[in-house]
Amino acid sequence: MGEEQSTVSGSGGARASGGGSAGQPESPRPRGDRVRTAGPRAAASSSRPNGGGGGRDPGCVDASVQEPASNRAPAGQPARLPLSGPLDPQSLELQLEREAEGAGPREAPPGQQPPDGLLLDVLAQRHPPPAKPQVLCSVYCVESDLPEAPSAESPSPSESPPQAPLGPIPASPPPSFPSSPLSLPADPLSPDGGSIELEFYLAPEPFSVPGLLGAPPYSGLGGVGDPYAPLMVLMCRVCLEDKPIKPLPCCKKAVCEECLKIYLSSQVQLGQVEIKCPVTECFEFLEETTVVYNLTHEDSIKYKYFLELGRIDSSTKPCPQCKHFTTFKKKGHIPTPSRSESRYKIQCPTCQLIWCFKCHSPWHEGVNCKEYKKGDKLLRHWASEIEHGQRNAQKCPKCKIHIQRTEGCDHMTCSQCNTNFCYRCGERYRQLRFFGDHTSNLSIFGCKYRYLPERPHLRRLVRGSVCAGKLFIAPLILVLGLALGAIAVVIGLFVFPIYCLCKKQRKRSRTGMHW
């Protein structure tokens, strides 16, 4: 019924039957034809209607099409082989090779894949066609600075790519820009597959090995505070150990990170804002970024507090208790009462302490700042109160602000005016050579709490006597020294010529020369 059936003759030729064109031969079949032999599993398949044989492979026998009765063998007898001559299992390969040589090379029609090989069912054992291996492809995009050298082998005409038109070749974009889209077949196994556009973004390399070996040091923040500064194995100037060290930005000397952190922490504990370089030969100050980078969180807070305290003007002061900065406004935080000093009354928003902005002390109700500075009992009681084995606060002798000591010695430095004073007595640090300093017991500049603190009259008498003795002894020693010097000069004027003559006479007597 309009179907086309084809059978294979013993000589390998194809003939048309049942509705096909009688005078039109069928195209030769490729080498991949499936050949079936009789066996228990060989049976005729039911035919399915098809419009003129469309959609079938023209080079293969459709197993679903029913063969004519003339080509079917009787039941129980094997079917005829599509080979010329009898089938010998021992010489099967040789017969197949001869048949292939006789048929000659055949090409698959366009748009059709070539067959994989001959598939035979010998003795009712079907060998399935070999499965196509799965290919996993990894695409790598590598950009080279140098163009590729042309290949020595010239491609064949069928494989040669289309020639590009002559003209100037546009410059390739830098690696930081996305490369041109790359077209790849959708199915690598199919000759005419679709295309997939892939974009490869090549980020520029942050550094290169030759650049690291020959590049100069990074000119950033510098020092240990710079995370991008180069590391070099140097000997620390403090601990004298070889470590990976970033040189300091000020003097380019080597100080390890551990020693620098210990030094900076000690300076911050002393209240220093301008910290000098730990190298003794360098007289410059370290940068703020380097100091903050090498401090702990607590020391960093203290250092920033000292910085703010040194930068503020007279209209901003810290709270005496919690160090919260407060800026005074002329119209006051509290409505101005009858007395003018009440407008300096400040309540700290952090610790709720009420204090006086003018004298920087706790609020003194009913007493003006002048009386309070002269020795008010409230101020003395608050300042001289002992907490944790030390005074509550001490007043700077110059700027009159109160300073609390957390730890350390009695030598204090005011963060407001940089005045050196003693925390125990509140006096300035003075020293004079030959008369002593503030730490001397018998010096007139000594602390009153170091020598006879309970007997001030005797202390003054002893120190005054020592000072007077030094004043009287110093001129005597000076006069005595001048007298001895004059005597030595006079004696030298007479003795030196005589000594020279005697030495000259001895030299002549040794050489045998006479007058």
Swiss-Prot record:
Its EC number is 2.3.2.31. Changing C239A: Loss of SLC40A1 degradation. It catalyses: [E2 ubiquitin-conjugating enzyme]-S-ubiquitinyl-L-cysteine + [acceptor protein]-L-lysine = [E2 ubiquitin-conjugating enzyme]-L-cysteine + [acceptor protein]-N(6)-ubiquitinyl-L-lysine. Residues 158-178 have a biased composition (Pro residues). The chain crosses the membrane at residues 476-496. Zn(2+) 3 binds at C396, C399, C414, C417. Residues 10-22 have a biased composition (Gly residues). GO terms for cellular component: cytoplasm; membrane. Zn(2+) 1 binds at C236, C239, C256, C259. SMART domains: IBR. A zinc finger (IBR-type) spans 301-369. Zn(2+) 4 binds at C422, C425, H438, C447. E3 ubiquitin-protein ligase which accepts ubiquitin from E2 ubiquitin-conjugating enzymes in the form of a thioester and then directly transfers the ubiquitin to targeted substrates. Mediates the degradation of the iron exporter ferroportin/SLC40A1 and thus regulates iron homeostasis. This is E3 ubiquitin-protein ligase RNF217. The lineage of its organism: Eukaryota, Metazoa, Chordata, Craniata, Vertebrata.
